[in-house]
Curated annotation (Swiss-Prot):
GO CC entries: cytosol
Presence of the UniProt keyword Cell division in the record: no
EC code: 4.1.99.17
Chemical reaction(s) catalysed: 5-amino-1-(5-phospho-beta-D-ribosyl)imidazole + S-adenosyl-L-methionine = 4-amino-2-methyl-5-(phosphooxymethyl)pyrimidine + CO + 5'-deoxyadenosine + formate + L-methionine + 3 H(+)
Organism of derivation: Fusobacterium nucleatum subsp. nucleatum (strain ATCC 25586 / DSM 15643 / BCRC 10681 / CIP 101130 / JCM 8532 / KCTC 2640 / LMG 13131 / VPI 4355)
Protein name: Phosphomethylpyrimidine synthase
Organism ancestry: Bacteria, Fusobacteriati, Fusobacteriota, Fusobacteriia, Fusobacteriales
Binding note for cofactor: Binds 1 [4Fe-4S] cluster per subunit. The cluster is coordinated with 3 cysteines and an exchangeable S-adenosyl-L-methionine.
Length: 433
């Protein structure tokens, strides 16, 4: 009847995933279906991911957030990463990407997919070296596609594919001076493979074969930005824009096959360039959902890049970005631990929510209004319940207990909420007693 969510939408078929998303997002079912059909909304939902609670990404929907997990050679503890998965899901993330970069990753990936109600993404090129136990240069073009198929068979909902880094883009990169060259891990690997083999990008050259795989499993392609800027100086340069144009062309080819697309974006970028970059992506990539890493608005804050990212993410999402990849305090320094992950998730969720208010996403402001009412009433239990990080709010209150229950240790009886509550109800205001 239909192979993909996009094909169903084009045929006027309301899938169970669409129905669920329309209800949870308070969006009209017909409007949602039209946007899935046009590609403005993507529903990453591999047919084999049975535990998935599908989410939509795109125009008119709440801003989604992704968490990156996975093992590395220096930190190969699978159990620690699986513990992160549990906590991330409890913290209401929308997507989890397995960015494992060491050894045989299949076991972790399969456990992740089984456990995760959130959509799961991967970067198959990371897996190729361990999968084949070969050096990068020795992997054949068709073998990269075979790894993509394996991930699809496992139930991965979306895959990052750096198909826009073709020979033209590589030649342009060589002619343009950058401070940080190529900072995308997958992009740098693909660049190295192309140079070492004097060959075209296998994903660009065999894009139709890639579409065959993704159509069969309804696996979304997240078109990676290999040439994204790795510092403020490199943002919005010719390399970045050239690749974005190519991603727009590949998007149209994918949509012709009813394969869903997400476009990945920067990166590192000054605040005053963010809105223009969002408009460029939406124009050049035909309003496909935009997924950004940050963007980080300054390069000088290692240890605090969850903050630099949240600033950029809020601005970007308010301007039209649909999907934020979280950044943790460990960015540029180490593999994040559990506490780093928690801080990154909270920072990203705050950015997404702030943007949703700006975008007038249905019911977004209601959360803030509930909190405001509880503050006016000095209802501590209500405030804790509505807090984005309830555990931290309760802990801070407990660690610094005031003399009077209707105050905190900042203002005491000079609390404005306490004063106005008493005045509005006709009570006396006593400060000294």
């Amino acid at each position: 009847m239909y192979k993909t969510q996009m094909e169903a939408a084009k045929k006027g078929i309301l899938t169970k995933e669409m129905k669920s998303i329309a209800e949870s997002e308070s969006i009209d079912e017909k409007v949602l279906m039209e946007r899935v059909a046009s590609g403005e909304i993507t529903i990453p939902a591999n047919k084999k991911h049975s535990s998935l609670l599908a989410k939509g990404v795109g125009t008119g929907l709440s801003t989604k957030i992704n968490v990156n997990l996975g093992i590395s050679k220096d930190c190969p503890n699978v159990d620690k990463e699986l513990e992160k998965v549990k906590v991330a899901i409890d913290m209401k993330v929308d997507a989890i990407m397995d960015l494992s970069s060491f050894g045989k990753t299949e076991e972790f990936r399969k456990k992740l997919i089984t456990m995760s109600t959130a959509m799961v993404g991967t970067v198959p090129v990371y897996d190729a070296i361990g999968f084949y136990d070969k050096e990068l240069k020795d992997i054949k073009a068709e073998e990269f596609l075979d790894v993509v198929r394996k991930h699809a068979e496992d139930g991965v909902d979306f895959v990052t594919i750096h198909a826009g880094l073709n020979r033209e883009a590589v030649n342009l990169f060589k002619r343009n001076e950058r401070i940080t060259n190529i900072v995308s891990r997958g992009g740098s690997l693909m660049y190295a493979w192309m140079e070492l083999n004097n060959a075209e990008n296998p994903f660009y050259e065999n894009f139709d074969k890639l579409l065959d795989i993704c159509e069969e499993y309804d696996m979304t392609i997240s078109l990676g930005d290999a040439l994204r800027p790795g510092c403020l100086n490199d943002a919005t340069d010719a390399c970045q824009i050239k690749e974005l144009i190519t991603l727009g062309e590949l998007t149209k080819r994918a949509w012709e096959r009813n394969v869903q697309i997400i476009i990945e974006g920067p990166g590192h970028m000054a605040i005053d360039e963010i809105e223009a970059n969002v408009k460029l992506e939406k124009k050049l990539c035909h309003n496909a959902p935009f997924y950004v890493l940050g963007p980080l608005v300054t390069d000088i804050a290692p240890g605090y890049d969850h903050i630099t990212s949240a600033i950029g993410g809020a601005i970007a999402a308010a301007a039209g970005v649909d999907f934020l990849c979280y950044v943790t305090p460990a960015e540029h320094l180490r593999l994040p631990d559990l506490d780093d992950m928690k801080e990154g998730i909270i920072a990203s969720r705050i950015a997404a929510h702030a943007a949703d208010i700006s975008k007038k996403v249905p019911k977004a402001i209601d959360w803030d209004n509930r909190m405001a009412k509880y503050r006016t009433d000095i209802d501590w239990e209500g405030m804790f319940t509505e807090a984005i990080d309830e555990e931290k709010a309760r802990r801070y209150r407990k660690e610094s207990t005031p003399e009077n229950e209707d105050t905190c240790t900042m203002c005491g009886k000079m609390c404005s909420m306490r004063t106005m509550k008493k005045m509005m109800s006709g009570e006396d205001v006593n400060i000294l007693k």
